């Protein structure tokens, strides 16, 4: 806050016109005439929003000190935005000005407040003595840190039995690493995770030096994989009945429900000011909840799900924590919100969505370790249900029991892949939200024709698209010594590469590629004048699952197909190859290769 204190003979003001943020005032506030006043011209600033109570207290203490020093008869608080270029929201400004007025009055000071948000004419006569013109910068104290609450209890849950982590005999290194990480026992190696090197080497993505840290540029191969993953989630959720929507990426923090929900997330938000204080979304919750609050729902509609792929979501992660595809400031998040009539219905839907999250691990060929988090009250009442859902995982899970509810959820299940360095990559999640229905005014009409607030499930079936790719690349690094690194066939940018041995084989090879493309196979042609050995090495570097070499014998008979996954060389006809690829990619989305078919025509990104 900035204040300018003028000890005046008189102050006269008259309101002229309202601005768009003017407060409503009675007739007697339209003008004012004050004598022997300490006039406090005041600008409430953005930083005051962090702790308005503190800035009110500090400002009042300073005003009373000057008031007593100059022996004024009264105080006039005059809103004056021109003292600062970094203003708070209008709502906060009015709250602070009213708070100052109330605090001064409680100290026995005769105080008046000039209306906020009006264009005004005013005249003032400054007394001109040494203390008659003073300026002050008032800083709020940092918000008091709440006393550390009781710590969570941790267990390993398997087949209905709970065991303290220290007493559990780990047979799964990934689960052991997850437990150590959650309990703060996993030491940092300081190494860069291998996916950062791989995303560059494979021409998928890279850091963009001209952007804010944590924002990536995507090359054609990487963009293709992202799009296929987005298509996959769309197919998955719509097959379960979800309805796709699209909502804005920027929200007004003057909306109290949005502001309170944002505060639950903490400080890691992109905020900006342009007359209003705005926030870039970190998930699709805000837009989804506003759609639902404007919709007419009855118990017959429930459960009802809406889905959005947020491209992009924004989180202002600390610069030192941003790394590769694992932790970004701008990312792509699939977000599913399901409105449930009551807690019983939400438990049924939760179990279904857990199965959907497990399916993504199977389809992506990624191993998930699982954490079930619940409040103590919820776990006590629904212990049997928690154990039943955990049993669906088919292996031990980490169980966190929170002593009380700190967030909007009472229970959630988090799925995490484990990277090469033994650290979790947070992927799918399902959460039971018991706050947002009421906060955002979402209601449905129940069977008794009463309007009630629903329970809402939050679910991201895969987690952020970037973290999915991160998990896939980290998996290849982990398995490098066991088998050739590769992506699932349906995500491989090039599924088949055709290598003509000599120029006389080029036309046949080109026709073969055309037939593969016509059959919805992503195929390309290495038409460069390189040795066959180099072409084979290049295909291996590109992790191409099937490599077809075309020589004289292949032109006369069956194809020689090199299978990357097994290292086999198989003889098969073109139709057999196409059918094999169709069988391996059945049910998965398909997009064409967004690159020139001939390698000689490609840009080297």
UniProtKB/Swiss-Prot annotation:
Q: Which CDD domains match?
A: ThrRS_anticodon
**Region Editing domain, residue ranges:** 1-146
Name the domain of life this protein comes from. Answer: Archaea
Instruction: Provide a GO biological process annotation.
Output: threonyl-tRNA aminoacylation
A single GO cellular-component term on record: cytoplasm
Give the cofactor note text: Binds 1 zinc ion per subunit.
Q: Which cofactor does it need?
A: Zn(2+)
Q: Where in the cell is it found?
A: Cytoplasm
Query: What keywords were assigned to this record?
Result: Aminoacyl-tRNA synthetase, ATP-binding, Cytoplasm, Ligase, Metal-binding, Nucleotide-binding, Protein biosynthesis, RNA-binding, tRNA-binding, Zinc
Amino-acid positions noted as binding Zn(2+) in the UniProt annotation, renumbered to this chain: 285, 337, 458
Which family does the UniProt entry place this protein in?
Belongs to the class-II aminoacyl-tRNA synthetase family.
Physiological role = Catalyzes the attachment of threonine to tRNA(Thr) in a two-step reaction: L-threonine is first activated by ATP to form Thr-AMP and then transferred to the acceptor end of tRNA(Thr). Also edits incorrectly charged L-seryl-tRNA(Thr).
Domain notes per entry: The N-terminal domain is an archaea-specific tRNA-editing domain that hydrolyzes incorrectly charged L-seryl-tRNA(Thr). Catalysis of tRNA editing is performed by the charged tRNA itself.
How does this chain assemble? Homodimer.
Q: What is this protein called?
A: Threonine--tRNA ligase
The coding gene here is thrS
